[in-house]
């Protein structure tokens, strides 16, 4: 139910996101597929140094995050640089954003179509691509366990 009490008009529920994370983990175990997922909420859903979201992206994972864009919906975070997140937003858009810092990308259709600064994503308000109030934040981290860049797989030994 949405804020007006209308059934089926509140988008994807938090319970659905928890379910998909659990389902991916169980499916991976049963079918021997190297997928791993973790459901995050609240303070764990932030973009910045030492955050689980950034750590996942640095290790080659992807993150499904709930953001504001006129209404709450989900985007796929696929990469980062020092101060920005690369993400795929399923909402099609041709016009540039009023916020010049939010970049519309048209030449990376299989990777991302937006670049958004960390500070815009970490905003607790309802601006475009804001993660919103900490108490309502949620995200799902997804990894291919065979391609995940863990310290054990990336450390080089010198003699």
For the regions a language model picked out, list residue spans one by one.
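Mixed-charge, low-complexity intrinsically disordered regions
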Residues: 1-2, 70, 137-159
């Amino acid at each position: 139910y949405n804020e007006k009490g209308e059934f089926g008009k509140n988008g994807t529920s938090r319970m659905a996101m928890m379910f998909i994370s659990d389902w991916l983990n169980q499916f991976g175990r049963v079918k021997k597929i190297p997928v791993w997922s973790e459901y995050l909420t609240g303070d764990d859903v932030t973009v910045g140094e030492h955050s689980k979201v950034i750590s996942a992206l640095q290790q080659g994972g992807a993150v499904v995050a709930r953001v504001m864009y006129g209404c709450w919906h989900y985007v796929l975070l696929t990469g980062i640089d020092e101060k920005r997140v690369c993400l795929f937003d399923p909402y099609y858009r041709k016009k540039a954003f009023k916020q010049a810092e939010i970049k519309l990308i048209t030449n990376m259709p299989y990777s991302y179509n937006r670049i958004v600064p960390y500070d815009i994503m970490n905003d607790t308000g309802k601006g475009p691509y804001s993660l919103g109030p900490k108490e309502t934040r949620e995200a799902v981290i997804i990894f291919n366990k065979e391609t995940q860049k863990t310290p054990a797989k990336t450390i080089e030994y010198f003699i």
